[in-house]
């Protein structure tokens, strides 16, 4: 771009009433600090139309997950989980919102006395020395088919939920089917009575509706690049009714594969599975209060597994290893991999770590310090991001990148803090991607942290240096990428007081085109639209014309969400089948119950076992 695409995105601004952009009063910051708080009680109602007109043919249901920080420095997307379902019809839009009550979240909400209470470690995770780690299960809602839905989380096992009630039903896999992610020496020190083991997995397990197979991973054993000889990645396969199958991934050199950072995304094609190490680092020293930054390395390690090598009589599988020359987090693949060629798309994360929080009293690059109010919100990137396409060639015993097919597009106005994608058939990859929509969260100069800028000062391929970073804020943007041309064909920049993090594609009735439908976006703004409501809003766009602005804006005084993560659209919902899978975890809790204090036993007996036992 370059800049002409950005200007095209603004061309539609004149069609939108200026009230959407108006600020009633002048303040130093246009950032909506209310993104850090939300209600902890259930709510429901019919959304009010604040602006525009809801399309007459919009339909279906959107599920949106969120995180609510519980204290200062708590990374907000990883906060206490909540989920909202939006029901669209010709009569309007209704919503229902509930907390995501995993067993560990229920326990944390009831226990606050030493030694059982949970303590925040490094802003990232809550830990109890007598019980283990909290799993908020709030990364992404997923569809399994047959009215079965699941929530996933990188720091704990996934759970199925009932779409009609929003209540969790069962973990996927018995807790004993998941391996502890702690290093062996730490694992040896954990008490047998632990209720909530530390499990690391991907934020995006893949539920293949064509083959009726589910794939995910379980990894750990190392801490960053320390203790990698004990590291492991287990590829898990599930038929949605039986126990999990698992294979330890081994490289061509005979050494176990490991992940030093995180594994936010999993790639699945017709014949292959791709495990990505993604750009979100959990620094070991952070857990003891040291705020040092381990910068991303401008690389994405990938392990490529052939599905045909997953033998039922073996517990290992060989993978080929490759490093891609960029940092990314959300990755999608064409399901079609004919001639063993794999095409993937993702963000280009320029000099940033999506899991890096702002901490209380952090020094800001442009002067001042982080306020207590915002401590825990993700730090701003220190360079503009982008969008990438990469292609891989898999042979019988190796894999290589088709370097000549690599594409990177960047835009110095639009591509700041590249975040979630949206596409038709969300979390179900099409044979070939034609259109992907992206959220760019934006750039706020008052969120640029000095220690982060220093850590990334020598990061490769920077367009902006620390000395040339913008001195004014750049707002959130909704971006339409044409995958065949690898270009931005349409875009919309939000008013400066808005934060948009979560887009979701909603198909039009009886349509098949990947751009034939609407875009749902969750927006938090400092100055509510037309001065109505609480600033927690839903904006609806025409997928073929983002630049014209929102078709409709909706809100409700009781719709009060915090930092949203991923969303899911489905055309219809129904009750979960009564005879569907359930993991029998009741005995797991009952055998440990006598080893705990009375208050903990009460929570197990009165709140956990009635739901999960």
PLM region spans:
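Beta-propeller domains
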Residues: 6-14, 21-613
